[in-house]
Each structure stands twice: as structure tokens, then as C-alpha cells.
Swiss-Prot record:
Annotated organism of origin: Shewanella sp. (strain MR-7)
HAMAP family, per database record: 23SrRNA_methyltr_M
Compartments (UniProt record): Cytoplasm
Residues the record lists as binding S-adenosyl-L-methionine: 187, 220-223, 239, 259, 276
A GO BP annotation: methylation
Keywords of this entry: Cytoplasm, Methyltransferase, rRNA processing, S-adenosyl-L-methionine, Transferase
Gene (name only): rlmM
List of catalytic residues: 305
Annotated EC: 2.1.1.186
Annotated protein name in UniProt: Ribosomal RNA large subunit methyltransferase M
Quaternary state and interactors: Monomer.
Stated role: Catalyzes the 2'-O-methylation at nucleotide C2498 in 23S rRNA.
């Protein structure tokens, strides 16, 4: 297929477009971007007929900051007839064989969501016809490709496929997380989503486990501390402001009424460092770099608040600088990931894992 369809947050189409333009160029897949403000999706139109196929296979979704989900796509199917929308879609998917799942989706906008009831109903007959044509297996198979049909408006859809090992497990790339009734703030969901994004499920028992020591810089009122506590960790919560009383009653939290930028841990046995401070992103990055150089943590998750303009450029500059500084200070083995999570707004979430191949004492 010729195109790559990418889901993103509404208002971040420019950032998603700039990123895919750069990343596709690195893979020598030429093309141009089609994007409109607040559409919540971007289409990268490749010059080569198989450009979308190449990108969906060779470009890791997890390496993209602003894309929630992506799939190799056909040209837009416009003006699908109300009397028979199924046949043109089945025909457009004739090159897809034995897919393991069907997702009929929309972009994440209020206008597109009005189609969600239709999408649910439409899935049933479409699934039956795709099984008959051989594009879809009779039984779902999580190891096979996923068929995507994304309606961007009534009778207008992009169709295509993604590989299950390079795809979000969620419809539209949106995780469905529940806000706990006793969580101190909605920001709690950001860290919950970050753990799911950056730590594979099969590794969570080892890397996100009870008894670990953690530090939360800028913790008040305790949204991120809450996620650490519910996972059984012992938390040093650093903030001049007050902490949630119920969190303090758990006995797992020690509150340090200090400036997060000046705090130094008393003991050097911290596995997780987390930080969600409303501060200039470069300053937060410098703080994390200092902690890494001092050897004060093994893994960190932190948020970078984004400027109003040049957001992709700013994020990449900060991440590139961080990599350079770590290497200059003898930290040559690390994993650095960044994602604009669903529960993020004008910010991105970064994960830094120092020396992943070395066991934690």
C-alpha cells in the first residue's frame, strides 16, 4: 500500500507530520504529508507504491513520539454508497490475507466520534464479508496482521493493515484506563499509562514491583505517588505543598517539604524516579541528567511541558542533548523513549532506563 495513516491528538497534527516526514526520510521512503488542524490524524503519502508497506514494517511505532497508532493505508475511499459500503472496502483490502483482527475506528475528535455507533454496527457485516474473501481469518489470531478501517467522515474511509507486533493493542491507540476513586488527581492516569507504555507486561513483575524504593519530585498532591504506592513501593515524596492524607496514612510515603530541584536522596537505593513538575522542559531535563550522572536511580519517568511553537523541534533538541550529556559522563548504555500519551495534554512523557543489561542490586 502507498500511504501510512497515523492517529494523533487533535491539535498535534503538525508535530506528527514533522516527525513522520523526518523518520520516513531516514528510511529513504520519500513522500509528502496530508494533514489538517484538529483532524487528529496525518496521512503520509509515499511516492513509491509500496511505501506504506515498508514503513509499517520497518518503522517501530514505539519510536514515534506523536503517533498513537499507524497502519499502511490505501487511497481514501470517498463517497462510499449507502446501499453498499462493504464491497468497495473488501475490494480495497484484496491484497491483505488471513488477518487476525478487524478494527473499525474513527479519529479522536468529537465530530468523528459521532460515527462510533455506526462503526460498531458496520463491523458485523464487514467482518463476515472479509472472512468470505479470505482477508480475515475465521477466528481472531493476535499474531496475525490487523485490518484497520478508519472512517474520517460519513462514507469516507481509509483502509489498510498493521502488524500485531508493531501496533497499539488499543482501538485508535487509546488505552481505556479507569480513574481510581481515591486517586488524589487525574494526573495519576499519566503515570499509570506510562508504566503500560514503557514497561512490557511480561517485565513489570521484575521492574515495577512491591518493595522498591522510589522518589517523586514535585509530588503534591500525590497523583503520581498514588501509582507507586498502589504497586507496593516505598516513596519519598518531595514537594513544599501538602500531600493527600490517605496516601500518608498508608505508611509507604515519606514527605520531604523541599524544592524538588534541590533535594538529594539520603540513601542511594532508589529504583524509580518520577517527576511531573510545571517547569521549563530544559530545566527538568537537566535535573534528570544530574540524577542519572550521580547514579541515584535505575529508571525514570518524567514529563516535559511543551512550548506553544516548534514543539517537535524542542523535544528532539532536549532528547538529543540528554543523550550527549549522558555519554559525556560515561553513561553509554541506556534506553531513552518518549511518547505523547493519551492522558498527556501539552506535554510528553519520557522514560530513561540506565544500563538495562545490568541487574539492580
Amino acid at each position: 500500500m502507498k500511504n501510512l495513516f497515523l492517529f494523533c491528538r487533535a491539535g498535534y497534527e503538525k508535530e506528527c507530520a514533522a516527525e513522520i516526514q523526518q523518520r520516513a526520510a531516514e528510511l529513504n521512503v520519500g513522500g509528502f504529508v496530508k494533514a489538517n488542524n484538529n483532524d487528529a490524524y496525518v496521512v503520509y503519502q509515499c511516492f513509491e507504491e509500496d511505501g506504506g508497506d515498508i514503513l509499517v514494517k520497518q518503522l517501530p511505532l514505539d519510536s514515534l513520539i506523536f503517533a498513537r497508532q499507524m497502519f499502511a493505508a490505501s487511497e481514501l475511499l470517498a463517497d462510499l454508497p449507502e446501499s453498499d459500503r462493504v464491497s468497495p472496502i473488501v475490494a480495497a483490502l484484496s491484497d491483505v490475507s488471513k488477518a487476525g483482527e478487524l478494527r473499525v475506528e474513527t479519529p479522536d475528535t468529537n465530530e468523528a466520534k459521532e460515527l462510533s455507533a455506526f462503526c460498531r454496527k458496520f463491523t458485523v457485516p464487514l467482518r463476515q464479508h472479509l472472512k468470505k474473501s479470505g482477508s480475515l481469518l475465521a477466528q481472531e489470531n493476535p499474531k496475525r496482521p490487523i485490518i484497520h478501517v478508519c472512517f474520517i467522515g460519513p462514507g469516507r474511509a481509509y483502509v489498510g493493515y498493521s502488524f500485531s507486533n508493531n501496533s497499539s493493542p488499543y482501538f485508535m491507540g487509546i488505552p481505556r484506563l479507569k480513574m481510581a476513586a481515591d486517586a488524589p488527581s487525574r494526573s495519576s492516569l499519566k503515570l499509570d499509562e506510562a508504566f503500560a507504555q514503557f514497561v512490557p507486561k511480561e517485565e513489570q513483575e521484575e521492574r515495577v514491583r512491591s518493595g522498591m524504593n522510589a522518589v517523586d519530585l514535585g509530588a503534591c498532591p500525590g497523583g503520581w505517588t498514588y501509582q507507586l504506592v498502589r504497586r507496593g513501593m516505598m516513596v519519598s515524596a518531595v514537594d513544599n505543598g501538602p500531600m493527600n492524607e490517605k496516601l500518608m496514612e498508608t505508611g509507604q510515603v515519606k514527605h520531604f517539604r523541599e524544592d524538588g530541584f534541590r533535594f538529594e536522596p539520603q540513601r542511594k537505593n532508589i529504583y524509580w524516579l518520577v517527576c511531573d513538575m510545571v517547569e521549563k522542559p530544559a530545566r527538568v531535563a537537566e535535573l534528570i541528567e544530574a540524577w542519572a550522572i550521580n547514579g541515584w536511580f535505575k529508571e525514570a519517568i518524567f514529563n516535559l511541558k511543551l512550548p506553544m511553537k516548534s514543539r517537535y523541534k524542542e523535544v528532539m533538541a532536549i532528547l538529543n542533548t540528554m543523550q550527549e550529556i549522558l555519554k559525556e559522563n560515561g553513561i553509554n548504555e541506556f534506553q531513552l523513549q518518549c511518547k505523547h500519551l493519551y492522558h498527556d495534554r501539552d506535554e510528553v512523557t519520557v522514560h530513561l532506563w540506565i544500563r538495562p543489561s545490568q541487574a539492580w542490586n
